[in-house]
């Protein structure tokens, strides 16, 4: 018999004030820009200041989001830490490469190099919470977080671990922003975030953030939802969305009729949001349609925020108006499906269910 997997705690650092788990999007920040920086908590509350000074923003976000998740789950013993990231600690990478050029490859400071690897966040979290177990980082572009989620799910189902910390983390950097603007992946003109669905231009608004989750095969008082499964597709044509969706739901003994809401990764790119329009055309009339990237921007592990959103919705049964594209006709949100893709590639489906 397949073991159940529960989301027992979560922590989020994003372009909204999500670091406070006492409420969920009660005060939404609206932006008019092309890049949305994360709203940081007081890092002194989570990281020793002498250590924080030497950390890049992405590392601080990751450690803090992880600690918030652990506190939210009542500080369980963690058997493994699995992270996903698209660009890793890119700020330190840029610092090190810049110093190579500026100093003619001599007298280099090693710190940026040591902290520039993609697994820096996972390693720093392990040191901080004294976890000596399995520690792995996935770098699979916009499927990075889902790869980490799938790994954790398999380990829990096979009893290789009892409680796992899983997260997605990506940070903004000046150089990467310039490159994405140059190739039109970021919009050329400032866009009002609350009007993103009406965008008629190419490119997205970009962001950064860290979202961590405590997964376990044991339910507890802090449990948010049950994770039924996740599926990834590197490439997927629009005309095949229907059969892939039906097959994914069928694998979990569900149909389109069972979906109470879907959480979609609309990012305002007129060229690729059509995937979501095709997807929504398949849904039943009672199924709610929700979106979130107008709140946090686009980045490789932005889909982790979708899991955070769906988990909050299932536990608290309250849907903030700012994320509703079409209101659900169901009185209770029991089954929620997440669908994300980036520029027509790296498609992912994740399914959550209430614990009742």
Segments from the language model and where they lie:
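Catalytic nucleophile serine of serine hydrolases
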Residues: 141-144
């Amino acid at each position: 018999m397949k073991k159940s997997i529960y989301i027992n705690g979560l922590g989020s650092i994003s372009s909204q004030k999500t670091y406070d788990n006492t409420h969920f999007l009660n005060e939404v920040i609206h932006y008019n820009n092309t890049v949305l920086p994360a709203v940081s908590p007081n890092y002194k509350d989570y990281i020793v200041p002498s250590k924080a000074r030497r950390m890049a923003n992405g590392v601080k976000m990751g450690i803090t989001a992880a600690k918030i998740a652990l506190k939210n789950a009542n500080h369980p013993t963690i058997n493994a830490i699995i992270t996903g990231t698209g660009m890793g600690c890119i700020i330190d990478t840029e610092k090190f490469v810049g110093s190579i050029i500026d100093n003619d490859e001599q007298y280099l400071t090693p710190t940026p190099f040591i902290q520039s690897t993609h697994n820096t966040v996972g390693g720093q979290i392990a040191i901080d919470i004294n976890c000596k177990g399995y520690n792995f980082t996935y770098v699979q572009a916009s499927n990075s977080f889902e790869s980490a989620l799938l790994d954790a799910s398999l380990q829990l189902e096979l009893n290789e671990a009892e409680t796992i910390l899983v997260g997605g983390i990506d940070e903004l950097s000046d150089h990467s922003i310039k490159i994405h603007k140059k190739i039109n992946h970021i919009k050329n003109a400032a866009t009002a975030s609350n009007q993103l669905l009406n965008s008629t231009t190419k490119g997205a608004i970009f962001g950064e953030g860290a979202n961590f989750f405590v997964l376990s095969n044991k339910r507890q008082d802090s449990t948010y939802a049950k994770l039924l499964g996740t599926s990834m597709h590197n490439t997927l044509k629009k005309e095949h969305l229907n059969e892939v969706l039906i097959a994914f739901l069928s694998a979990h003994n569900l149909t389109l009729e069972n979906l109470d809401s879907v959480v979609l990764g609309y990012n305002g790119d007129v060229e690729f949001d059509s995937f979501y329009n095709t997807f929504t055309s398949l849904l039943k009339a009672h199924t709610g349609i929700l979106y979130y990237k107008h709140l946090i921007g686009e980045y490789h592990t932005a889909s982790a925020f979708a899991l955070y959103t769906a988990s909050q919705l299932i536990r608290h049964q309250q849907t903030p108006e700012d994320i509703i594209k079409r209101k659900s006709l169901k009185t209770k949100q029991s089954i929620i499906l997440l669908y994300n893709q980036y520029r027509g590639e790296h498609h992912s489906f994740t399914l959550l269910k209430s614990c009742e």
